[in-house]
Amino acid sequence: MSKKLSLSGQSRKTVEEVFNDFVISQTAQGLSEITIATYRCHIHSISKHLDIQKPMNALTKGDLEAMVVSMRRSGLAHNSISSYCRVLRTFLNWSKRNGWNSPFLYASNREMYL
């Protein structure tokens, strides 16, 4: 008997919960432990500048722009911000492919300085 995955309840998930799903998916696909550790470290750093307890479907372009501004104001190096944004872009692209159909999520990787 096969078990179907239910997408109900997806709209109530926070950014952090969806990110955890992303990490599980990437681990299952065989990404190295070092890459997974980097993702976890980066989301921890990102959470200082972006509310990851916010519902995923409520994430806006403005939230990400405010995150970048906050990172710049806190004195983070350009390379650090770029690294965090690359991980976030990878996560947002995965989110789009996995049913998070906000038009913002698709547009974000081209419109933002990520």
Question: Where would I find each of the regions flagged by the language model?
Answer:
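N-terminal core-binding DNA-recognition domain of tyrosine recombinases/integrases
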Residues: 2-6, 20-114
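A detector for short, charged/polar N-terminal pre-domain segments
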Residues: 7-16
